[in-house]
Structure formats: structure tokens, C-alpha cells
């Protein structure tokens, strides 16, 4: 038998695939939750890009922009019933707070911080005042999985390493925007230095063992 070829689908997976067969047992409510989970990453990517554009161009978000954001999600392929099922009001408020604070603090969005090919990362929003010796890093979370401040400590350490500014030479504030709340942390120089030491030590270990191979 000559089977039909679906070249455009090769290497891709259906939203409800055979390998994730548990959807066979779903009722409509469970199916809706499953689909919301399936689209969560895509929604996060879209919202991050909206935030990036607004912070970059210094255009604040207002409550009346909620429908515009919803329209962007729809235009990017997110089903309307998924948007209705998630806490979109809370999600938009969280996005608005993150964007407007980023603009207020004159931050730069999506900045890559690099130490080596083994250690680099992208800060959602970052600003550094050479006058005040103050580092500010904000992270935006669109999902509900509990965030950890360690991620931002790594960014602070990467900043220190890339720009050769010792942790004791600057103060910092780290923020995570998630589920309508803001987690604040003012790390000590010792906290950041501990991460710096770990990064440099692990980088040497990786490079040494890679060279041996």
C-alpha cells in the first residue's frame, strides 16, 4: 500500500497525540485544562514578545489594552476558548505591571548576558546605573509554576563576570512578576559572589573535560 505523505507534518506532534494517550479518558473539563497546558508555552512566548516591544519602545500598557493583547493571542493561533479558560484578566494585569515598571526604571528588554559558551542567559529586563552602581533585573513569568530567585542571581553573576564589576562594587534589586504578585530580593554581595565562584569553577571543569575528549 502506498501511504499518504504529509511532508509538512513530519517531525511535528499533534496537540492530542497518540503518545500522550491519556486524553482518551478526559471529560470536557479535563480536556480544556489539558489544552490550556498545551498552549501555555506558546502563550508565554507571545506575551514575552509583547512585553519586549513595549519596554523597548517605551509604550506603557493600560487597562484598555487588554483586548488588543487578547487579539494578538488569537491572531497567533491561540483558541478563544483557551483564552476564556485561563485567568486572562490576572495574566494581563501581571503583564501590565511588569511592562510599566520596566519602562519606569528605563530598563532594556531581552538582554543576553555572556560569560562563556557554557554559561550565558537572557534577562527579561535589566538596567545598570553606573552613577549609582545599582543593578536591576526583572523577570516576567506568565505561568503558574513557582519561580525561583536563583535564576536572577545567576543573571546578576553573569553580569558581574561579563562586565568585570565585582559584586561588592554594586547594589542590586531582583524582581519576579508572577500571578499578579511581585517577588522582591536585594541580594548581598556574598550571595552573588557565591554564584560567580560556582560558574567559574564549573566552567573550568567543563572546559577541561571537553578538551580531554
Cite the ranges covered by each PLM segment.
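Nuclease catalytic cores
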Residues: 1-89, 107-111
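N-terminal interaction/assembly modules
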Residues: 52-56, 101, 213
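Hydrophobic, Leu/Ile/Phe/Ala-enriched alpha-helical segments that form helix-helix packing faces
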Residues: 54, 95-99, 159-163, 206
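Internal catalytic-core helix/loop-beta-alpha segment
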Residues: 86-129
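Charge-rich, solvent-exposed alpha-helical interaction surfaces
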Residues: 91-94, 198, 205
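Nucleic-acid nuclease catalytic cores
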Residues: 111-197
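Accessory terminal regions of nucleic-acid processing enzymes
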Residues: 204-213
Amino acid at each position: 500500500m502506498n501511504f499518504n505523505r504529509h511532508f509538512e507534518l513530519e517531525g511535528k506532534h499533534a496537540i492530542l497525540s497518540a503518545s500522550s494517550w491519556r486524553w482518551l479518558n478526559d471529560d470536557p473539563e479535563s480536556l480544556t485544562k489539558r489544552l490550556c497546558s498545551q498552549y501555555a508555552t506558546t502563550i508565554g512566548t507571545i506575551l514575552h514578545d509583547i512585553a519586549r516591544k513595549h519596554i523597548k519602545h517605551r509604550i506603557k500598557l493600560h487597562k484598555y489594552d487588554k483586548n488588543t493583547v487578547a487579539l494578538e493571542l488569537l491572531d497567533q493561533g491561540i483558541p478563544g476558548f483557551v483564552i476564556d479558560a485561563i485567568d486572562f484578566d490576572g495574566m494581563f494585569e501581571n503583564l501590565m505591571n511588569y511592562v510599566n515598571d520596566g519602562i519606569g526604571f528605563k530598563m532594556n528588554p531581552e538582554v543576553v548576558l555572556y560569560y562563556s559558551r557554557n554559561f550565558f542567559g537572557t534577562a527579561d529586563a535589566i538596567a545598570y546605573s553606573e552613577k549609582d552602581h545599582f543593578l536591576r533585573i526583572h523577570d516576567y513569568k506568565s505561568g503558574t509554576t513557582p519561580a525561583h530567585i536563583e535564576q536572577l542571581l545567576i543573571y546578576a553573576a553573569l553580569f558581574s563576570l561579563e562586565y568585570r564589576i565585582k559584586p561588592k562594587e554594586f547594589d542590586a534589586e531582583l524582581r519576579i512578576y508572577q500571578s499578579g504578585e511581585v517577588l522582591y530580593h536585594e541580594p548581598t554581595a556574598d550571595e552573588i559572589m557565591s554564584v560567580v565562584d560556582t560558574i567559574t569553577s564549573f566552567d573550568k571543569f567543563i572546559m577541561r573535560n571537553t578538551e580531554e575528549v
